[in-house]
Amino acid sequence: MKALHASLFAVSALASSIVAATPSFAQNPAAAGGAECNFDQSKPQSVARATLAMAQAQSALAGGDPTPQLRTIVGLLNAAGAKNENPVARAYLLGSAYLLLLERPTISPIAVRSTVGHTVDPTGLIDLYAAVDSALTIVEQSSPACAAQVTPFRQQKPWLAVTNAAINAVNASKFDSAEIYAKRSLTLDKTSPYPYSVLTTVEKSRKNYPAMMEYAKKALAAAGADTTYADVREQIRFELATTATTRSETATGAEKKALAREAITAWNDLMANDPVEVRATAAVANLASLYVVAGDSASIPKIYASMLTAPSKYGESALLQAGVVASQNKRPKDAAALFAAVVERNPYQRDALNNLAASYLFMDEFRKVGPVVAKLTELDPSNPDNWLLYAFMYSGLMKAEKTPKLRNAYTDSLVLYNTRAEKMPMKVAFTEFSRNSEGTTLIGTIENRAGPAKSYTMSVDFLDAKGNVVYTGTAPVGPIAPKASKEFRIKTEKTGVVGYRYKPLV
């Protein structure tokens, strides 16, 4: 029986960007739940003047440049003696000013102090991300109400910008830049899983697996059970599983087995949390090989046990891969049940039909083979392997039959279909059937098995779930030399395609 799916062993990219609402800067802000974060913004004089300058900066944000007012605030609140009286109001205003400065395109995050308003040590450097964190930490520590108020402050535009920069950089494999941006993001806010997820990928790229594991744990902890972060949790679990699998593949001896067990745990954790189908399919494929490496082949049926009892919870591809795993481990009854679940959902799934027929043959359920092969050859008529399934079926029926007349009839049918398969002058095979939001692509080959060079025309109907023809495409193929093959491709922008059939080649 042919293996249908190779291990889908790739790491999906992080989300391209994140978005969040940006709260406005407030005077004596109210925290969540109605509790107030109160501090007096009228004293000392430096705080009062900075409060007025902040109001002017807010007005300038509408269409002007608030940088002069922001520099004034920084200068006032860092003057000699300004730190000691009313430190919470000072820190709140200073953190707000630094955040707004980070939004200005002319201000560098690592800036010369004088450019942001400092008069003390004016030629030194200031890290505005660290400065924001230091200021807002003072406010957070002043009361629970203020701590609640500061949370949305930390996730304003500068945090969004640097976090998205980290995501974009890691997706572009610019890992050094991604690390810088992610750590700046964490300086502003440590409650989001996104920067930890970025750093997980960065350390994976460096093969620094202890650091990767640490960041992965932090990402999962930050994501918690929040449904907003479901994609992040799945991404992290997939990273952990694929990394442990890769390490197991390159390891030897006891370490190889230990890493295989680690990967098994990671894949099972992923499967327990309802991953998207492509990752569920990867989990099934990888778990099968990992159990062998770990010396625990007896556990392979556990991979698909829940699929047998509740196939509706799983996608077509994952069920198909599970059927392959079951058949490879000589469990044709399980394989047949899984392939049948695919066919019940999608009667135009030729790989499932092919393997379902083969599973019935292994089970000696010969009378179940015919209807399956009839459907298969209706979809895929110019593949001799499909017609050979009839020959295997009649061979089984013939051997089990006691009545001479029926034995002879079955023998005649066996010879008929075996001859048809052997003498078919061409063979159609498919190498890709991909479907996504951009359309549908079918790629295959035609082999000239006998005779002179010949050209063919592939005419393919793409079918929806009800069997309706969504699109008909044709592709000229040839001339094809004897004993040679040529590729064909048929593409359409049509979506909603679940299967295909083609006209018999002549």
Regions inferred by a protein language model and the residue ranges of each:
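Canonical positions in the second alpha-helix
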Residues: 80, 135-139, 184-185, 218-219, ...
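Register position in tetratricopeptide repeats
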Residues: 100, 171, 205-206, 239, ...
